[in-house]
Amino acid sequence: MRAAHIVRPVYMFMTVFSVSLLLLAGTNSTFAAEIEPFVGDYVGSANVVDSDGTETPRDMSVSISELKDGFNVSWTTTTYKGDGRIKEEEYSVDFKTTERPDVFSAAMKRNVFGHEVPLDPMKGEPFVWGRIEGATLTVFSLFIGPNGGYELQQFDRTLADGGLDLSFSRFRNGEKSRSVETFLEKK
């Protein structure tokens, strides 16, 4: 009689544990199906348009890769200044799944416990997050200035035949200050 009382709780625990693993596996495979079409290396160039209408030529590349529990977006921009100077900037952000479907948090630094966490916009660092909506992977970056004003950058990367359509916008306190649209070819 005692063995039956022990076996039943163990059986129930194993059943709940197995169902939980199946649900987690389903969640991960759903995620993989969402990011997989975006995975790859892309290159292109465009003229960035400032709010005053001036244009600056820029080369761009982006690499999107799948991670164990999220994905990485790494991008490089090379700006050609009118005086002959060349400015290159590189960025790389890991994105982790969240409890919200299709919304991803940025893991840009580690806290004292070794966990990856977003940066703190109240310290002048960008708050970054991403989302997948249909055929578009969007990365947002929010900056809060010393006076409380803000800057929001939005990178929309939409799947297109042979690559990605890139649409970038920068808003300062609600006013669009810079934008670019171009095609990035898959390598």
What are the language-model segments listed below?
Residues 13-26:
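Bacterial N-terminal signal peptides
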Residues 45-52, 56-57, 69, 79-187:
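Calycin-type beta-barrel ligand-binding domains and close structural analogs
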Residues 1-10:
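N-terminal secretory signal peptides that target proteins for export/translocation
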Residues 73-75:
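Single-residue "anchor" positions within short linear motifs
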Residues 1-2, 26-33:
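Basic/polar N-terminal segments that are highly enriched at the extreme N-terminus
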Residues 30-43, 66, 131:
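N-terminal helix-cap/turn-to-beta initiation motif at the start of protein domains
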Residues 58-62:
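Active-site-adjacent core segments of small-molecule enzymes
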Residues 5, 16-18, 36:
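Generic extreme N-terminus detector
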